[in-house]
């Protein structure tokens, strides 16, 4: 994503729709006409935009630990405070405050190494880039009205113990899609791909089979 990893530090603000365009452009650049796409958390917001803006690029869609709705006023205000915090205090302080929200308490207690790896990844990002990503999420569009335009096979996967995205929000996403299954995993938090990789992989495999991409 823009601003993360080895990408350049963004100068101008950008939107979730811009990141969806980036993803479509990447597929074009590496000569992949269409793909099964999984979007985790922020990636799910990007995937929803990609399905509307570049529908021919997506053959199947997996929404993982994510939702269709926009930020509430309270959540948007909290993001502004977090943006200021990460700029003032740095990425390490942000990671220390953020990472505990990502995992279920039981998993975090039993797997400190995995939690530590997540902390290292987040704390290694640039504060300005984190703030810009938070701002893009704060201003993202409510995609609920567009869900009935999506015809590709879809699946919603998440943890019932997710502290950031409610089970209700994930069910609302699934119900708005015409061809979509849902798997909510017990005793799993936001990091469903880390806490329950086998179950997530199974659902992705099932999605690929439904889309005729996997035998």
Question: Which residues make up each language-model segment?
Answer:
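Short alpha-helix in the alpha/beta-hydrolase fold that links the catalytic acid
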Residues: 152, 166-175
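Alpha/beta-hydrolase active-site loop signature
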Residues: 1-5, 68, 189-192
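Short beta-strand/loop motif that positions the catalytic acidic residue
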Residues: 150, 156-158, 162
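Active-site loop/oxyanion-hole signature of alpha/beta-hydrolase fold enzymes
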Residues: 1-38, 199-206
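Conserved hydrolase catalytic core segment
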Residues: 29-72
């Amino acid at each position: 994503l823009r601003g993360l990893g080895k990408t350049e530090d963004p100068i101008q603000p950008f939107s979730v729709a811009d990141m969806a365009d980036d993803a479509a452009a990447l597929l074009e650049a590496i000569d992949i006409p269409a793909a099964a796409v999984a979007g985790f958390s922020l990636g799910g917001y990007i995937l929803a935009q990609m399905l509307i803006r570049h529908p021919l690029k997506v053959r199947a869609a997996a929404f993982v630990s994510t939702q269709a709705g926009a930020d509430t006023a309270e959540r948007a205000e909290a993001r502004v405070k977090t943006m200021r915090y990460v700029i003032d205090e740095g990425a390490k302080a942000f990671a220390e405050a953020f990472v505990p929200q990502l995992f279920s308490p039981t998993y975090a207690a039993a797997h400190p190494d995995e939690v530590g790896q997540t902390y290292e990844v987040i704390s290694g990002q640039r504060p300005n880039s984190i703030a810009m990503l938070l701002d893009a999420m704060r201003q993202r569009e409510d995609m609920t009205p567009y869900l009935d335009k999506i015809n590709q096979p879809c699946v919603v996967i998440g943890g019932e113990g997710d502290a950031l995205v409610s089970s209700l929000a994930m069910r609302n996403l699934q119900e708005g899609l015409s061809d979509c299954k849902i798997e909510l995993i017990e005793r799993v938090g936001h990091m469903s791909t880390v806490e329950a990789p086998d179950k997530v992989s199974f659902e992705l495999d099932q999605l690929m089979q439904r889309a005729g991409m996997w035998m």
